[in-house]
Amino acid sequence: MDNLVLLRHGNSLWNQENLFTGWVDVRLSELGEKEAKTAGQLLREANRYPDVLFTSLLTRSIQTAHIALMEIDRVWLPTFRSWRLNERHYGSLQGKNKAQVLEEFGEEQFNSWRRGYDTPPPPLHSQADDPRYEEPPPLSESLKDVQNRLLPYWQGVILPHLVAGKVVLVVAHGNSLRALVKHLECISDTDVCQLNIPTGIPLVYSIDPSGCATHPGRYLP
């Protein structure tokens, strides 16, 4: 039986404006709220009722989880939040329009920053203090960096709940979920460039006690 549900947050205000978002804490758009509600409905129709919830520390992830769980009467779920599930930090690209970055730097560099595995964008020069984080946030991250900070959390915190027989819901971001799916499906560093996780559609797996996926992920319905 499928025991892991991955859900990318719904469309955000900056997704709507085609801006690089990263760790900037923006809210869901009206479309994103509808996507989150639909995600909850899909969980109900598929009879996928999670026992525990994991989210990032970013509002769009938390909003999506709350709206989806309202649809299945599970807002009371035990909940764990971690910066390790945050979106990839896009460095100095954060807040910039993707089309303008593409025009300025060209398709090859743009795709390397956006979809490549081990190429971080240009870093920020400094980072404002944020009470959510005990240590200073990164100034930029590649997808490899995201995977390196996510996998210890997966193995040490999330996986034990699956081994204990729980159904786990992880509501996170395009790149943190790409990093996890890369691990679960053993996707190569090259092929992961083609992997995209759509907003607001539950992606389900069956995870065995060793932490391996027994089948490729499938989207509901």
Curated annotation (Swiss-Prot):
<feature type="active site" description="Proton donor/acceptor">
    <location>
        <position position="87"/>
    </location>
</feature>
<keyword id="KW-0324">Glycolysis</keyword>
<feature type="binding site">
    <location>
        <begin position="174"/>
        <end position="175"/>
    </location>
    <ligand>
        <name>substrate</name>
    </ligand>
</feature>
<comment type="similarity">
    <text>Belongs to the phosphoglycerate mutase family. BPG-dependent PGAM subfamily.</text>
</comment>
<dbReference type="InterPro" id="IPR005952">
    <property type="entry name" value="Phosphogly_mut1"/>
</dbReference>
<dbReference type="InterPro" id="IPR029033">
    <property type="entry name" value="His_PPase_superfam"/>
</dbReference>
<feature type="active site" description="Tele-phosphohistidine intermediate">
    <location>
        <position position="9"/>
    </location>
</feature>
<feature type="binding site">
    <location>
        <begin position="21"/>
        <end position="22"/>
    </location>
    <ligand>
        <name>substrate</name>
    </ligand>
</feature>
<feature type="binding site">
    <location>
        <position position="98"/>
    </location>
    <ligand>
        <name>substrate</name>
    </ligand>
</feature>
<feature type="site" description="Transition state stabilizer">
    <location>
        <position position="173"/>
    </location>
</feature>
<comment type="function">
    <text>Catalyzes the interconversion of 2-phosphoglycerate and 3-phosphoglycerate.</text>
</comment>
<dbReference type="GO" id="GO:0006096">
    <property type="term" value="P:glycolytic process"/>
</dbReference>
<feature type="binding site">
    <location>
        <begin position="114"/>
        <end position="115"/>
    </location>
    <ligand>
        <name>substrate</name>
    </ligand>
</feature>
<keyword id="KW-0312">Gluconeogenesis</keyword>
<feature type="binding site">
    <location>
        <begin position="8"/>
        <end position="15"/>
    </location>
    <ligand>
        <name>substrate</name>
    </ligand>
</feature>
<feature type="binding site">
    <location>
        <position position="60"/>
    </location>
    <ligand>
        <name>substrate</name>
    </ligand>
</feature>
<feature type="binding site">
    <location>
        <begin position="87"/>
        <end position="90"/>
    </location>
    <ligand>
        <name>substrate</name>
    </ligand>
</feature>
<keyword id="KW-0413">Isomerase</keyword>
<feature type="region of interest" description="Disordered">
    <location>
        <begin position="114"/>
        <end position="140"/>
    </location>
</feature>
<comment type="pathway">
    <text>Carbohydrate degradation; glycolysis; pyruvate from D-glyceraldehyde 3-phosphate: step 3/5.</text>
</comment>
<dbReference type="GO" id="GO:0004619">
    <property type="term" value="F:phosphoglycerate mutase activity"/>
</dbReference>
<dbReference type="Pfam" id="PF00300">
    <property type="entry name" value="His_Phos_1"/>
</dbReference>
<dbReference type="GO" id="GO:0006094">
    <property type="term" value="P:gluconeogenesis"/>
</dbReference>
<protein>
    <recommendedName>
        <fullName>2,3-bisphosphoglycerate-dependent phosphoglycerate mutase</fullName>
        <ecNumber>5.4.2.11</ecNumber>
    </recommendedName>
</protein>
<dbReference type="InterPro" id="IPR013078">
    <property type="entry name" value="His_Pase_superF_clade-1"/>
</dbReference>
